[in-house]
């Protein structure tokens, strides 16, 4: 249950009446924004400790000063408290929690849920929605190499469903024995499923088991005088044996573990995770964080909760987890919760012996190296922010920058892009695009006015206006933004600046205008603040171009269909609902198109001819 939903929050009364149950608490500021999420075995003791006279670090003191309200959720156990805490942190990303930012979106191999499944790869954790996932892999090249290896050993289809459904005869992959051609019924469901089951074992790292099973199948097929089938198994074994010889270490299936190394320097920390399977490093991942006021134990505690109690996709959970030295007593409850979530006991190794110590040292070296890179990059970016602040004569630190750019194709398909940079760097998840409507063809000024107006309107409502707004363009563009600022009365809330190439249009010689100031400024091309302006502007330009190209492509495909007599809005919608997009429709056969509700065979033929 949620306690305290009142608008008038009485802190003294709240603290006096707190429960001693376990649960999760949320600290909110005066704007109603969650600034910290925590969990506790005893909510009363934990929350009261923030307001006691005991020693506290500067970060905690700063947070306490901003608390305007506290909410709690009572949970039936510590396990549920850990899960809820983790989910709330991911959902709200409170500024006083330790936030882990994975270095990249990792690719996964996915076996689809089709009757005859395909194997493919997807980036990011949304991959699990596509089917059974294996991974993550450390890079696109590694996952593509694995796909290539799979195709040589296991004749499982890799084609898109639209291509698969349109086949009337086997493709080249069947001819070179890299697919069983389920598209035209050349393999039974049982035979296909047998190959699929072995593939899943292979992807799960059960190499020895795969070799044994294929070998047994080969001998059985030979005894049954199914010599062609036996030859297929033999060919699989040949490729697998070659693959086995390429491995650096012997296969040791009992050696499946994660190694977590941590390194701290000043107010920053880095975590390196090595995933070991069969005695070999199969993946390494890194997280770098701002860790002011935190120690190794609190960071490790937060990371274990973030990684193992989150939505991480793992097919093989480690039997052992090796950690950098931390205070074991402080994380025992969390360890039990992790074991409960993944459904198996874990051997936690805090002080590894010689055999495993080398892995921990390797993880810690990786963490240190990554932190050196992170702090160097962070330092350079902070210098650019400070230089821009100085140029703009700003009294407050720059926490959020937004930049607008306009793109169109011959005056049509106009898109406004808005990219976001924070004091941590580019925030890709916050980028967005605006479809510009009801303006004259090619009118960039009206497009800027509309996009900025929509952003300012929503920003005032959500109380998330940027500190600096950059407009890609010259005097004309910035004057349009100024008009919007006057309309909403935010001249003193957001600093406005534009960056244009001027008459010469030479990169590095851009003209700069500050909001409500007609003075033309120039900065040295190596000035850190100028480099930041160009960096953000170029990012906005790229984002706009990509969006505009997508819109042009969609408009062209849509206009092609609109020219066909008998295909109105309802049928266009039905086609999109069935195929999911114009690209998939363009690949479909006449018979496949005719399956769409309301589309006759004759009309399907006309639609097909539009794309061919």
UniProtKB/Swiss-Prot annotation:
Spell out the Pfam families in the cross-references.
Answer: GIY-YIG, HHH_5, UVR, UvrC_RNaseH, UvrC_RNaseH_dom
Q: Which GO terms describe its cellular component?
A: cytoplasm; excinuclease repair complex
Q: Which domain of life is it from?
A: Bacteria
Cellular localisation = Cytoplasm
Q: Which residue intervals define the domain UVR in the entry?
A: 208-243
GO BP term, pick one: nucleotide-excision repair
Q: Which InterPro entries match?
A: GIY-YIG_endonuc, GIY-YIG_endonuc_sf, GIY-YIG_UvrC_Cho, RuvA_2-like, UVR_dom, UVR_dom_sf, UvrABC_protein_C, UvrC
Which key words tag this protein in UniProt?
Cytoplasm, DNA damage, DNA excision, DNA repair, Excision nuclease, SOS response
Single annotated GO MF: DNA binding
The entry's family comment says: Belongs to the UvrC family.
Looking up NCBIfam families in the UniProt record yields: uvrC
Its biological purpose = The UvrABC repair system catalyzes the recognition and processing of DNA lesions. UvrC both incises the 5' and 3' sides of the lesion. The N-terminal half is responsible for the 3' incision and the C-terminal half is responsible for the 5' incision.
Subunit structure of this entry?
Interacts with UvrB in an incision complex.
HAMAP family from the entry?
A: UvrC (MF_00203)
State the name under which the record lists this protein.
UvrABC system protein C
Q: Which organism is it from?
A: Francisella tularensis subsp. holarctica (strain LVS)
Its gene name is: uvrC
């Amino acid at each position: 249950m949620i306690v305290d939903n009142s608008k008038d929050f009485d802190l003294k009364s709240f603290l006096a009446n707190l429960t001693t149950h376990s649960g999760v608490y949320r600290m909110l500021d005066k704007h109603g924004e969650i600034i910290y999420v925590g969990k506790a075995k005893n909510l009363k003791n934990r929350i009261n400790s923030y307001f006691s006279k005991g020693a506290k670090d500067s970060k905690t003191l700063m947070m306490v000063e901003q608390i305007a309200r506290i909410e709690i959720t009572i949970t039936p156990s510590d396990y549920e408290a850990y899960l809820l805490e983790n989910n709330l942190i991911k959902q709200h990303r409170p500024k006083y929690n330790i936030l882990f930012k994975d270095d990249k979106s990792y690719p996964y191999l996915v076996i689809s849920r089709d009757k005859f499944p395909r194997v493919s790869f997807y980036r990011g954790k949304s991959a699990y929605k596509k089917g059974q996932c294996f991974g993550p892999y450390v890079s696109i090249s590694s996952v593509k190499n694995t796909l290539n290896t799979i195709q040589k050993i296991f004749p499982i289809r890799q084609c898109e469903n639209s291509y698969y459904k349109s086949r009337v005869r086997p493709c080249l992959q069947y001819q070179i024995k890299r697919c069983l051609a389920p598209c035209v019924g050349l393999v039974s469901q049982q035979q296909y499923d047998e190959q699929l089951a072995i593939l899943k074992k292979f992807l799960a790292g059960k190499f020895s088991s795969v070799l044994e099973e294929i070998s047994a199948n080969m001998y059985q097929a030979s005894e049954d005088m199914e010599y062609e089938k036996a030859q297929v198994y033999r060919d699989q074994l040949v490729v697998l044996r070659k693959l086995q010889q390429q491995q650096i270490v012997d296969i040791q299936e009992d050696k499946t573990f994660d190694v977590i190394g941590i390194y701290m320097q000043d107010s920053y920390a880095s975590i390196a995770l090595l995933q070991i399977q069969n005695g070999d490093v199969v993946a390494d991942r890194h997280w770098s964080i701002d860790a002011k006021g935190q120690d190794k134990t609190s960071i490790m505690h937060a990371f274990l909760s973030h990684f193992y109690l989150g939505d991480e996709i793992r097919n093989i959970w480690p039997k052992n987890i090796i950690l950098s030295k931390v205070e074991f007593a402080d994380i025992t409850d969390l360890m039990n919760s992790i074991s409960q979530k993944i459904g198996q006991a874990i051997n936690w190794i805090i002080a590894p012996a010689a055999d495993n110590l080398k892995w921990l040292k390797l993880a810690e070296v990786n963490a240190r190296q990554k932190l050196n890179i992170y702090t160097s990059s962070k330092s350079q970016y902070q210098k650019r922010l400070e230089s821009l602040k100085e140029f703009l004569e700003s009294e407050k630190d720059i926490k959020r920058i937004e930049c607008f750019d306009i793109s169109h194709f011959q005056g049509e398909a106009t898109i406004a892009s808005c990219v976001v940079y924070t004091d941590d760097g580019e925030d890709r998840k916050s980028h967005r695009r605006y479809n510009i409507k009801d303006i004259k063809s090619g009118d960039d000024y009206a497009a800027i006015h509309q996009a900025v107006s929509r952003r300012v309107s929503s920003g005032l409502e959500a109380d998330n206006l940027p500190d600096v707004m950059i407009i890609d363009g010259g005097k004309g563009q910035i004057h349009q933004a100024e008009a919007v600022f006057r309309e909403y009365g935010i001249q003193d809330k957001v600093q406005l600046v534009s960056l244009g190439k001027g008459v010469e249009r030479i990169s590095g010689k851009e003209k700069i205008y500050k909001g409500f100031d007609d003075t033309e400024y120039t900065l040295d091309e190596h000035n850190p603040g100028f480099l930041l302006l160009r960096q953000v502007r170029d990012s906005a330009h790229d984002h706009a171009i990509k969006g505009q190209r997508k819109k042009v492509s969609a408009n062209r495909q849509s206009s092609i269909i609109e020219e066909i007599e008998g295909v109105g809005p309802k049928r266009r919608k039905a086609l999109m609902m069935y195929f999911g997009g114009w690209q998939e429709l363009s690949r479909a056969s006449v018979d496949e198109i005719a399956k769409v509700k309301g589309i006759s065979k004759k009309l399907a033929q006309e639609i097909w001819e539009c794309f061919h």
